[in-house]
Amino acid sequence: MNNLVPAQAGAQFITLFIFITLARWYVAPWLAKRERADALIALLWVHVFRYVALQIFVAQRDGFPISTHGAMEIIIGDVGGAIIAFAAIVLLRQGAFAGVVLCWLLVAETATDTFLNIRSGIEEHLMGAASGVTWMILVFFVPAIIVSVGLLAWQLVARRSEPRNEHQRRELPVAAGRLLEQR
């Protein structure tokens, strides 16, 4: 009996459950105490390191049975996501609304990338084939990406009416500023 598939799937599920629990108990309350841009930036940093997907070439060389097309799909999606995340951080730090737009783009890109990677993994029978660093990325980093993109989407929706930055908050009428502070 091959225990590799249930081991990987089980480990991914457990990690996902733990990250969701951490997000509920600790991350969500912490985000609520931050300005919108700061909350988004904190969540974006997880995505900046998606270039770790370049490791797929080493895994492929060492016997991970992914096709070159499948590897390139992963690289394009994850390196692209890392670039979008970093650009969004830069723009949010400058107070530019384009940073929020890039956050939405990252949510859509990550959802698409995740779907395509799952589809490719099924088509190429990759579940349970990972080992070493590839296994660690799939079991720990991928669930972190999934949870952080969920939190990112939640922050974008829940805080869509907040001013973009502290400067805009100071320009609000006094009563409007008090309403925002009570949130």
What is the predicted role of each segment?
Residues 4-5, 65-76, 127-138:
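Non-cytosolic membrane-interface motifs at loop->transmembrane helix junctions
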Residues 12-24, 80-88, 140-155:
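Hydrophobic cores of alpha-helical transmembrane segments in multi-pass inner/ER membrane proteins
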Residues 27-40, 93-99, 161-162:
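Membrane-interface helix-boundary motifs at transmembrane edges
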Residues 51-62, 111-128:
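C-terminal ends of transmembrane alpha-helices
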